[in-house]
Amino acid sequence: MKNCVGDHTVIVPVMNGADPADRVRGYLSHGTVIDSLIYIVAFANADFSVTQQDQFANLHVGIQNASEAQWESILSVSRLLNGAGIDCEADRDIQAEIWKKYILNCAYNVETALYDNTIGQLRSDPKKAAEYEALVEEAYQVALAKGIHVEPKHRDAILHRFYYELADNATSSLQRDVKAGRQTELETFSGYIVKESKRLHIPAPVSERMYGQLGEICHKDGKAGTK
């Protein structure tokens, strides 16, 4: 891919996690890499088709502290995608948007995968619901320590979504991958937050415990690796 990238190339990695654009930047010395996140419920089928659940697919793009030239590239991407019928919003504070979704996934993906429970099963169990809250709080505290502009209202909105908005039968991609014995995004949804919590000296005992437990499940009998 490096040989295809020039100074005017614009790359928009649409991937899970808090740092995919930074990782792409580490591989490339040219071009503009734009951070992004997407809100969508979709999964791949055995025949390689993709099923989208619900009716939303909202993409956000941006670069933190973008220069004037970078912002023009971001706006060009937004105009291009909106013109193609893709709901795309350009965000000045893209890291806040990324982390609002990432904090949710640090709880949503991790706990559904560990217990192989739906969201309805988690929130109907007081102990598991309390663990979900702890996972959210730990990721939120890491975000604050990193200087991300998240506020208590954002954390509270994530918890409100858990208790009152998510469907009872909702599952996660990590849960489905672990159950099927496929490669997983455990490092994306759990390993990264545990690593950052240690680096920043932020206590994250529930995240650390579940990361260890899921790691054992994923590697049991060579059943599944991690991406």
Language-model regions, residue ranges each:
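Rossmann-like NAD(P)(H) cofactor-binding subdomain of soluble oxidoreductases
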Residues: 1-49
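NAD(P)-dependent Rossmann-like dehydrogenase/reductase catalytic/cofactor-binding core
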Residues: 2, 82-83, 133-227
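Internal alpha-helical scaffold of NAD(P)-dependent oxidoreductase catalytic cores
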Residues: 3-6, 27-32, 47-153
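Gly/Ser/Thr-rich helix-start
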Residues: 18, 63, 182
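Generic structural signal for helix capping and beta-alpha/helix-loop junctions
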Residues: 19-21, 43, 98, 160, ...
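Short amphipathic alpha-helical interaction/hinge segments
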Residues: 44, 114-115, 218-222
